[in-house]
Amino acid sequence: MTHPMVLQLRFTRSEFMRALRGISDEDAGKRFLPMNCISWNVGHLAWQEQSYFLYYAQGQMLRPDIQEAFAYGGPASTPSLKEMKSAWKTITAAVDPWLDSLTTAKLQENVISNGKPINYKYGNLLQRVIYHYWYHLGENMAIRQILGHERLPVYVGNIDDKAPYQPEQADNPTMQ
């Protein structure tokens, strides 16, 4: 059984992508200072998932170009939305099997970096990613409003059907 926190991440990802529907590559590359452009934000979240769930969790670096160009504090740029969505899809698809394997016990483990445990736990990283998506989703929607886009998606979509609250099940060994 997939951990409830992972289900929340998946819903969050789907909402992030839903908020990009109908935007042109040109508009996604427009920057309103001090914000980054929408396409950069997509690359940035691909960077975070790759860093946390591929590199820290599995020792893999699938897209070094994403690591260099979209890290926290990285240089502003206006990449192609199509290219960033492709990178995001590649990275999230590679992350998913690890996410599917998560248990409550694993989420409580300290992250290992350079062979040593650090202060973060995998559960903390998962929460950071979820909240980070919502931050940039809001930023992206603000940019779309500035651009004059209309009929934008409504906040949190169909959460009741797609991501209802699910308690951890103490008697379920996959959650332990």
Where are the language model's segments positioned?
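Short, charged, low-complexity loops and linkers
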Residues: 1-5, 74-77
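Short, contiguous alpha-helical
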Residues: 6-10, 17, 25-71, 113-176
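Short, flexible helix-adjacent loops and helix caps
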Residues: 21-28, 104-107
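Hydrophobic alpha-helical core bundles mediating ligand binding, dimerization, or RNAP-core interactions
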Residues: 9, 13, 20, 88, ...
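Acidic/histidine-rich alpha-helical segments that form the ligand environment
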Residues: 73-113, 121-135, 175-176
